[in-house]
């Protein structure tokens, strides 16, 4: 009940009028940069709006970064991302720096738990970690993540920025009095978001290859009297389709002092720790935008009259809304299953303690090792599929409002902004092709056989559990058989291909994996039976799984006999059980 109350209160808070006013201000007053003084002396002065700053403070205080670092609990990530899901539609992009802050905190925590840091490194990283995970806006930091360069793009191995070791006695302090690092970095970063952050994790070449570095954004001047940029200057801010409140810049690095993270030449390995976090953020953030868009569509349907009747009573309108809601439900199950896996992997002891004496059947995951394998495989799929589906889903939401959906007046109705901002999720942290290639690397890499085995064991375990549940619930047997057939096809048709063939068919492979996992999760949800706290009846749960496996074909033959029952279920799926007809016919499997 405590979590439910927390989420309910937070959900109410993020849609209050003062929040929409802050969003509006952040949108209407995008960041600006001043690069020179009146007399032509170079300087970098970044200005962000009051709305942006206040929204960032609100998110920090709510713990959108801090929650998983405050408690060693496998469910902390679920709690964090449920709040983020509610927050994203109101955050005016402050979750972008927050996601990178989360990734940086994860990376520093990993190194602080080891024994390879020098005393100075440990001191500096400890202070940075404290600030990254703080809920106090006056103390908290955000972090940038600088990888992209003109020559390399997503291929970070073509990074041209260079780091030179200048010695531990080089001296200097950052803006907070901590010693500057022994590396000097120079180069150019073509695309860097969260330019107003207090630190950054970045990639640069050393004599031993691509390496990762920690660097503060500001340092104390040599005379100790002023604070200046730590060898960073903003060349320009990026003009963008969306994310307008977010300061995204081209950066020139000239003598940026930094600390090496990990070993030289292992930059990709180190930065992957951040990417694994930010990709989950991307998936859940996309779902947050989509969920907000659907909420607006539902609210509109309840008040908009066409030809004297509310849209919520228009069967064709409700059918389209139900189809969108089905896609949303499937992607929500997939996205939050990925979050569950992340929490288990990060807090294995908590998971093991919670499962002592509990049979495997009711658990979505049977072991930490299984969670690790599934997380590595499913994270890029979640990132890609959730962001792309949200883009399509939000387009449907815009269309459902008619001309209102294209307008950007009041922020509480502004689906256009949600669509614009979400579309960045499709591209950054890896496009579709980059994610598809990553999946092939997972399946054909060193641990590929182990990960494949873990995946199919998981599918088998869940289907067995659902078979047992189907003895008490009509309509599940056919769904179990259909998913089993999909899983077999995945194994026999796709995973027998060579790496080269898989890369060519990367999108189709990703879709096949996604549909199996989403089907299993929707089936698992249906097997729980009657109405739960979500308000979904068992008929709706079964229907969601059924429709996922058998999507309605707009060009297929019309069966008038099925019209009444699907229309009633459409209403429940789109608008909730409170709106459903009390005369809902007994459910019949549509397989």
Place the predicted regions along the sequence by residue.
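A glycine-rich, basic-preceded beta-loop-alpha segment at the flavin cofactor/substrate interface
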Residues: 223-227, 235, 247-278, 295-313, ...
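Internal helix-loop-helix
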Residues: 41-134, 138-139, 193-194, 428, ...
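C-terminal helix-coil-helix/basic helical segment that borders enzyme active sites and/or dimer interfaces
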Residues: 330-383, 494-504, 527, 531-534
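Extended, hydrophobic alpha-helical segments in both membrane/secreted and soluble proteins
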Residues: 128, 141-145, 159, 184-188, ...
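C-terminal amphipathic alpha-helical interaction region
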Residues: 446, 462-591
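Extended, charge-enriched "interface" segments that sit outside catalytic cores
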Residues: 1-73, 587
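Alpha-helix capping/hinge segments and adjacent helical runs
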Residues: 369-458, 553-587
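A short core secondary-structure module
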Residues: 178-229
């Amino acid at each position: 009940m405590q979590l439910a109350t927390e989420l309910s209160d937070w959900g109410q808070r993020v849609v209050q009028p003062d929040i929409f006013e802050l969003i509006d201000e952040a949108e209407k007053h995008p960041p600006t940069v001043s690069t020179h003084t009146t007399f032509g002396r170079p300087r970098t002065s970044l200005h962000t709006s009051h709305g942006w700053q206040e929204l960032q403070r609100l998110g920090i205080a709510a713990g959108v970064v801090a929650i998983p670092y405050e408690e060693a609990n496998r469910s902390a990530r679920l709690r964090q991302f449920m709040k983020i899901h509610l927050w994203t539609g109101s955050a005016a992009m402050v979750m972008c720096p927050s996601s990178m802050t989360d990734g940086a905190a994860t990376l520093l925590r990993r190194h602080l738990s080891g024994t390879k840091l020098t005393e100075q490194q440990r001191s500096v990283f400890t202070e940075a970690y404290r600030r990254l995970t703080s809920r106090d806006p006056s103390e908290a930091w955000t972090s940038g993540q600088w990888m992209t360069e003109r020559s390399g793009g997503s291929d970070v191995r073509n990074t041209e920025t260079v780091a030179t070791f200048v010695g531990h006695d080089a001296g200097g302090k950052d803006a907070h009095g901590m010693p500057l690092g022994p590396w000097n970095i120079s180069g150019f970063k073509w695309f860097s978001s969260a330019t107003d952050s207090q630190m950054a994790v970045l990639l640069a070449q050393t004599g031993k290859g691509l390496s990762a570095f920690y660097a503060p954004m500001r340092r104390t001047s040599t005379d100790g009297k002023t604070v200046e940029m730590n060898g960073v200057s903003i060349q320009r801010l990026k003009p963008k389709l969306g994310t307008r409140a977010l300061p995204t810049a081209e950066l020139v690095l000239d003598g940026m002092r930094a600390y090496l993270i990990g070993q030289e030449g292992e930059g990709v390995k180190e930065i992957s720790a951040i990417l694994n976090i930010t990709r989950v953020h991307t998936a859940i953030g996309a779902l947050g935008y989509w969920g907000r868009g659907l909420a607006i569509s539902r609210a509109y349907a309840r008040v908009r009259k066409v030809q004297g009747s509310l849209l919520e009573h228009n069967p064709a309108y409700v059918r389209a809304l139900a189809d969108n809601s089905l896609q949303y439900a499937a992607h929500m199950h997939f996205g939050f299953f990925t979050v569950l896996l992340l929490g288990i992997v990060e807090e294995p002891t908590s998971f093991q303690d919670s499962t002592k004496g509990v049979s495997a059947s009711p658990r979505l995951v049977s072991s930490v090792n299984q969670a690790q394998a599934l997380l590595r495989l499913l994270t890029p799929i979640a990132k890609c599929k959730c962001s792309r589906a949200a883009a399509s889903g939000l387009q449907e939401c815009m269309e459902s409002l008619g001309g209102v959906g294209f307008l950007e007046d009041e922020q509480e109705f502004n689906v256009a902004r949600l669509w614009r901002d979400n579309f960045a999720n499709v591209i950054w942290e890896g496009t579709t092709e980059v994610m598809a290639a990553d999946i092939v690397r997972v399946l054909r890499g060193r641990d590929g056989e182990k990960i494949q085995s873990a995946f199919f064991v998981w599918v088998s375990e869940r289907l067995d559990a659902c078979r047992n549940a189907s003895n008490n619930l009509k309509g599940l047997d056919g769904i179990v058989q259909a998913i089993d057939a999909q899983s077999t096809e995945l194994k026999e048709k796709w995973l027998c291909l060579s790496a080269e063939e898989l890369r060519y068919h990367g999108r189709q492979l990703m879709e096949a994996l996604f549909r199996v996992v989403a089907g299993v999760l929707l089936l698992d949800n249906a097997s729980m039976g009657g109405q739960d706290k979500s308000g979904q009846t068992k008929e709706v749960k079964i229907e969601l799984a059924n429709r996922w496996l058998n999507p309605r074909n707009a060009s297929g033959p019309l069966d008038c006999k099925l019209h009444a029952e699907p229309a009633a279920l459409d209403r429940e799926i789109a608008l909730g059980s409170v709106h459903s007809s009390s005369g809902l016919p007994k459910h019949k499997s549509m397989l």
